[in-house]
Amino acid sequence: MKKRYFAIPILAIALHFLLSNLLYFLVERLVLDVFHIPSQQFMKHSYWGEILIYAVLILVFFTLYKLLWRKEISEPRTATNFKDVLGSLVVGFGICGISGLWIMLAEQLPSLQKSVEAMNAGTENIAGGNAFGTFMIAVIAAPVVEEILFRGIVLRSMRKFTPAWAAILISSVLFGVYHLNIVQAVYAAFMGIAAGILYEKKRNLLFPILVHFANNLITMLQGFAPSEVNELISIFILIMIAPAGYVVCRSLRQGKRADSM
């Protein structure tokens, strides 16, 4: 039985990689070869194809998530409530503040400067730089798909054969590595740890999704906002680091009290 759970994380990540690339290829061929839409026009509105792809991915992985854990529906789960929703957003904002400090450090290290440039270029190219497309893809769709995959499937499968701390750490490292950029991998892994702790303690996917949502929302705003607004955003997310740490530590303490009962 444990061998089955050992294989699930590897297979799920591989499925996401293969399916997303296959869907991108099919959409591109459909638009260019079947509908004969000019490539320049396709690139301008390519975010609609990406939104469609993410909709399919959400459907596939949410269905897989439900099928995997259908027999554990009675497992204790924290109901959605305002306090934990707000706490999850605070954690996301705080993680973004820590990410900002890490990126500032990485920019000063010659060995990481190319990774920073590649990461920034990739962020700018999301949805062709379209604000609506970026919001729908990076802020809404990506957090849903990635949290279902890495917290709902990968982390939860690992909990069947490893202790909580190991499952959270390993799934977070895999989440970081999956971004294929060393600078992005570090802060993605850090966010994964915070999201993993909330999921482990609450067993409600909404909370890590909100962490991811808040983090990506700030990143998007920083990409589109004027420099004056960016300065205010930077101050805000730095201030949020301490409250974020408090929320995560409180979740850990609550978990210990529950475990001792």
Where are the regions a protein language model picked out?
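Interfacial transmembrane-helix boundary/kink motif in multi-pass membrane proteins
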Residues: 1-18, 44-48, 69-101, 160, ...
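Hydrophobic alpha-helical transmembrane segments
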Residues: 6-14, 48-57, 85-90, 125-145, 232-237, ...
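Alpha-helical transmembrane segments in multi-pass membrane proteins
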Residues: 14-68
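Functionally important transmembrane alpha-helices
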Residues: 17, 21-29, 172, 177, ...
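Juxtamembrane helix-loop-helix connectors linking adjacent transmembrane helices
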Residues: 37-45, 72-142, 160
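Membrane-interface capping segments at transmembrane-helix boundaries
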Residues: 66-73, 247-261
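Membrane-interface helix/loop boundary segments of multi-pass membrane proteins
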Residues: 145-170, 197-204
